[in-house]
Structure formats: structure tokens, C-alpha cells
Amino acid sequence: MNLPNKLTVLRIIMVPFFIAAYMEKWFFVAFALFIIASLTDMLDGKIARARNLVTNFGKIMDPPADKILVYSALCLFVENGTIPGWTLIIILAREFVVSGMRTVAASEGIVIAAAMSGKIKTVLQMVAVIILIIAVGPVPQLKTIGMLVFWASLVMTVYSGTEYVLKNKSVFSM
């Protein structure tokens, strides 16, 4: 297994430790784990492209690894009342629609590349989570900023999902 793939696997392995730290109210540890895991997301793709180490494993496993990390944090925020549950349902619905469309396209031999709006959505979600971890814990003054970034990520989630469906509507006739 090459280094980028190891980083992707590491990100997935870190999720239960992040959840445990957050639930134990070890917010600094949860914060550090989430930041490290988020950095592995940035590094795995850069290393894979720079060193010509792009693999099917990486292409397939990187997006779910990101989602497992971010959505586990969002579930924790719903559980403690930081964000409303309906927002998580919108986010998950977008992911199911996009993933379903990608699966149908792939079954026809078509690869649909990730759009910039989807990448922006992911970055906004990660930034919101990072701020909200600290806001729920030691620095509650950051909650307003964290929630503003979260709402921006929700808008980008809806926008990127809509853009994806409209650009790839031919998938519905496959």
C-alpha cells in the first residue's frame, strides 16, 4: 500500500478516536485529531499526484473517508444540539443523490469528476467542524463564527448538489 492510500486509511482509523475524545469532552484532543485527519485529506491527493501514485483504491476510498470524518462530527453536533438535525438530513440526502448518480454513471463506464463547488463545500464543512469543536468546548465565544461557516457550508451543499444534478442529468436516462 502506498503512502497516499495509507493516509486515507489513517483518516478512517482516526474517526473512532476523534468521536471518543469528543464524547469524553477532551475537546483539545478531538480538535487535534480532526485537524490531523483533515490534513491527511489534503496530503494524500497532493502526494499521489506529485509522485504518480494515483490508484483506484485512492480514487474510490478518499471521498468516503472525508465523509466519515466530517459527518461523524456533524452527528455529534446534532446529538448535543449544536446544529439542527434537519441540516444533517439535507447534507446526507445530497451525498446519497450524488453517490447514486456516480454509481450509475460508473456502471456505464463514465467517470464524473468532482466539481470545484463540491470541494469548497468540503472545506467549509471541515472549517465549521474545527471551529465548532472549540466553541462547544473551551471557547464558546466562537460559536457564532462556527455557525456562520456551518450555514455557508449548508448553502454550498445545496448549491453543489443542484449543480451536480443539473450538469449530469443524463445519468437519469441511463
Where in the sequence are the language-model features?
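Alpha-helical transmembrane bundles and membrane-interface segments of multipass inner-membrane proteins
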Residues: 1-174
